[in-house]
Swiss-Prot record:
It comes from Naja kaouthia. Keywords: Disulfide bond, Ion channel impairing toxin, Neurotoxin, Postsynaptic neurotoxin, Secreted, Toxin. Expressed by the venom gland. SUPFAM superfamilies: Snake toxin-like. Produces peripheral paralysis by blocking neuromuscular transmission at the postsynaptic site. Binds to the nicotinic acetylcholine receptor. It inhibits muscle contraction with an IC(50) of 0.23 ug/ml. This is Cobrotoxin-b. Coiled coil: none annotated. Belongs to the three-finger toxin family. Short-chain subfamily. Type I alpha-neurotoxin sub-subfamily. It is found in: Secreted. GO terms for cellular component: extracellular region.
Amino acid sequence: LECHNQQSSQTPTTKTCSGETNCYKKWWSDHRGTIIERGCGCPKVKPGVNLNCCRRDRCNN
């Protein structure tokens, strides 16, 4: 599985995720604006953090 791993609005980069079945994108807002984090897996998130998990290559941009 290949997942995007760039932060927020940086140039898209990807990572090969051995043994993973999901990519994720999570985002939240703070004093800097909207922060977006992407990567492999499907993590648990705190209340107030939005999470989208998906199962296709590069589906988390």
